[in-house]
Curated annotation (Swiss-Prot):
It catalyses: 7-aminomethyl-7-carbaguanosine(34) in tRNA + S-adenosyl-L-methionine = epoxyqueuosine(34) in tRNA + adenine + L-methionine + 2 H(+). Gene3D superfamilies: QueA-like. It comes from Rhodopseudomonas palustris (strain BisB5). GO terms for biological process: queuosine biosynthetic process; tRNA wobble guanine modification. Keywords: Cytoplasm, Queuosine biosynthesis, S-adenosyl-L-methionine, Transferase. The keyword NADP does not apply. Its EC number is 2.4.99.17. The gene is queA. HAMAP family: QueA (MF_00113). Monomer. PANTHER family: S-ADENOSYLMETHIONINE:TRNA RIBOSYLTRANSFERASE-ISOMERASE. This is S-adenosylmethionine:tRNA ribosyltransferase-isomerase.
Length: 360
């Protein structure tokens, strides 16, 4: 399909720079194909679901993946900004760096805050390899838990570029950009639909008879990358690591066999569930990378409803929601959201999308 079909104009004023408080006070647009759009709030979610529905959240935890440093021996040069995007092993990370042209293979970068170092010593990394578009492979002097601790001490919250370009990240973001479910460290971007949940909403869902399940997909920085090719078939999707336990898969399959719907909280949960789905719609345990790219024409096998934020034009995520509800339906929904003052992107409002039962 032509990428331009997924383009739309979004006023800069629609981009949320802070979340609302409390989190479940965010607005939520309910989209049912063939039905009138409903303007609701996230706290209405229990009333919009049915007893027996299965809510699936992503429990990944965002790491402090934004590092600042300088090349050793080049103190007068501009600082090096590195965003860790993918763990390769116990001591190596793939990263996006700026300015990448300043780095060569073999260079050593010392990371810290204005020359300070973490308690474990200097956090140094050697540039092992350079790729396209600012990608490098960094080999750190620390390994395993020691490296994780050093990154946590020296790093900052890796806010999306559409927020970080408008304001400086601060300590509040360390809390705001983490879901209440965050448990397994490894993401460099938040599963943003989960940001809307509160203990009160969780309790109300349980009282409604909705069961909550957890999976893990470590969201990568590729989630922010626009589709630059003219045809979606030519786009190469980024890979992310995810796991679904056998117990979770069995519980979801049993509930669905009894008529319960699977409701994915976020596109990350949906992508992992669909990656693990068999042809008959049952879900298998999963522990692997997924690079699933969902565009209109995709046959959904596992997910019946999706709660998700509002996404970027020409993004793989807007393509995904267009596949879920139909391109024309989502174009109309986004026009309504923009005209009605909904807040977009990571800190913005939510949508609750239902697909046609016949396509189950």
């Amino acid at each position: 399909m032509r990428t331009e079909l997924f383009d739309f104009d979004l006023p800069a004023s629609s981009i949320a720079l802070r979340p609302v408080s409390p989190r479940d006070a965010a607005r939520m647009l309910v989209v049912r194909p063939g039905a009138t759009l409903e303007d609701r709030a996230v706290r209405d979610l229990p009333a919009l679901l049915q007893p027996g529905d299965q809510l699936v959240v992503n429990d990944t935890r965002v790491i402090a993946a934004q590092l600042t440093g300088r090349r050793i021996g080049r103190a007068t040069e501009p600082r090096i900004e590195a965003t860790l995007i993918k763990r390769l092993d116990g001591s190596r990370w793939q990263a996006l760096v700026k300015p990448a042209k300043k780095l060569a293979e073999g260079d050593v970068v010392r990371f810290g805050h204005d020359g300070r170092v973490c308690l474990l010593g200097h956090l140094d990394a050697t540039v092992e390899a350079k790729g396209d578009a600012g990608e490098v492979t960094l080999a750190f002097t620390f390994h395993g838990p020691a490296l994780d601790q050093a990154i946590a001490e020296l790093g900052a919250t890796p806010l999306p570029p559409y927020i970080a370009s408008k304001r400086t990240p601060d300590d509040q973001d360390a809390a705001d950009y983490q879901t209440m479910f965050a448990a397994n460290e490894g993401a460099v971007a938040a599963p943003t639909a989960g940001l809307h949940f509160t203990p009160e909403l969780d309790a109300a869902l349980k009282a409604r008879g909705v069961t909550l399940h957890r999976l893990t997909l470590h969201v990568g920085a590729g989630t922010f990358l626009p589709v630059k090719v003219d045809d979606t078939a030519e786009h190469k999707m980024h890979a992310e690591w995810g796991t679904i336990s056998e117990a979770t898969a069995d519980a979801l399959n049993a509930a669905r066999a009894q008529g319960g719907r699977i409701v994915a909280v976020g596109t990350t949960s949906l992508r992992l569930l669909e990656s693990a789905a068999r042809e008959d719609g049952t879900i298998a345990p999963f522990a692997d990378e997924t690079a699933i790219f969902i565009t209109p024409g995709y046959r959904f096998r596992a997910v019946d409803a999706l709660m998700t934020n509002f996404h970027l034009p020409r993004s793989t995520l807007f393509m995904l929601v267009s596949a879920f509800c139909g391109l024309e339906t989502m174009q109309a929904a986004y026009r309504h959201a923009i005209d009605s003052g909904y807040r977009f992107y990571s800190y913005g409002d939510a949508s609750l999308l239902f697909r046609e039962p016949a396509s189950r």
